[in-house]
From Swiss-Prot:
One annotated GO biological process: cell differentiation
Compositional bias of kind Polar residues: 100-113, 188-197
Official protein name in the record: ETS translocation variant 4
One Pfam family, short name: ETS_PEA3_N
Major localisation: nucleus
Amino acid sequence: MDYKMDGYLDQQVPYTLANRSQGNGPLNRLLMATKRKYMDAELPPQESEDLFQDLSQLQETWLTEAQVPDSDEQFVPDFHSENSVAFHSPPVKIKKEPQSPGSDPSQSCSHKQSFSYPNGEQCLYASAYEQKRAAVAGAGGSKSSCPATPMSPMQHYSPKPTVGTRQESGYMNPPSSSQSHACHSHSYPMNPSSRFPSGSAEMCPPFASQGQALQRIDPAHASGGGGGGYHRQHSDPCLPYPPQQTFKQEYMDPLYDRAAHINGPQPQRFPPAHMMVKQEPTDYTYEPDVPGCPSMYHHNEGYSNPQHNSEGYMFENDSRVVPEKFEGEVKQEGGSVFREGAPYQRRGSLQLWQFLVALLDDPSNAHFIAWTGRGMEFKLIEPEEVARLWGIEKNRPAMNYDKLSRSLRYYYEKGIMQKVAGERYVYKFVCEPEALITLAFPDNQRPSLKAEFERYVNEEDTVPLSHLDEGVSYPPEPAATNMGPQPYSKGYMY
């Protein structure tokens, strides 16, 4: 059979005369002739007739009904052949839906526009009720002379909602007197079937174009337009947020608006009564480090009481909280100003190498420590005296040269001093004289060395009870009324 069909197109199917032949006479006659010419002789005549009749009916159905419509809707052909049950499941009727409003970018909720609202929530899903209520609203709605009248995507909200119903301008037809005025170049096409009563909280209005002027329709004005006004009968509104924002947006609290307190009463922007927005004031305070010293970061905007505005801010005198730097007390005696304590003492205690430089800088100390004249070498002529003075400076009466020499070895590792080999009690600084003086005496301030101990301490680092005299008898403490005198041998008070 294949060798007979070389002159024809691929997969030519012979056909017999079909039941539905009107409108396709030439085609059926051609197929009938082809069938008679190329029919296989091995098939029984009756079976081939039935088979070709079924194929002819399917071919006719495909040719007549499987046409791509002009719209973008996907079309599924509906097979109503009487013999199609033998090849397919029982016949199913497919309902042809009207064109979805989601295909129109100007009417789709999912089409994001680049305009912002002061408040509200963004809607990302198209309405599932527009197709179901299109027929009802188209039959019951008033025929408008301007079907492209722009509807405000913002809900007309009032702080005091009407009992039972809520009128919203996004789903209202304005009166006929204002329809001709509302038709302008910025309007987007809106099918009258999309203006319908909504009874669900999932409904969201479509967004308008960027250049469209947002119109606020007065509820009293819109409700007087006859049968064109519709109501939403649910208590959970869907406020449109700006499409370009994907973060949480909170309302501005009028307590934070300083202009409202300064310039007098102004319209306050409170959130609507049906929306609960959690507001927490910014904490401008913290626990002060110094007890009794208030924080310098107290901010008036953190309080709701308007009387704080008269007190002003506490940014003027902040040195009482944290001083810029710790400096020695400045005293003035005899017309001369000096600081109590050297600058390096402000950064910590006096170090040993600084103490030695201070001793070498004073010529009156040449009898126990002096320069040798060979660079930065110096000799401890009386090392015990130097150790004693160092003990006075550090309030360590038990200081001796052995302890002092162990402290000097620390400077060997740090590269500050070195021990001169072959000579006893001779050391040298490894830096330049100018650098040594600069580091030892910052701001050219010589330290004031201590001449005596702050208090008398014996060699055993104990403080004797020198204020108590053994020879003086002290009166005993007055005994309690229920106790006798204490049998202490001496008059010490314990």
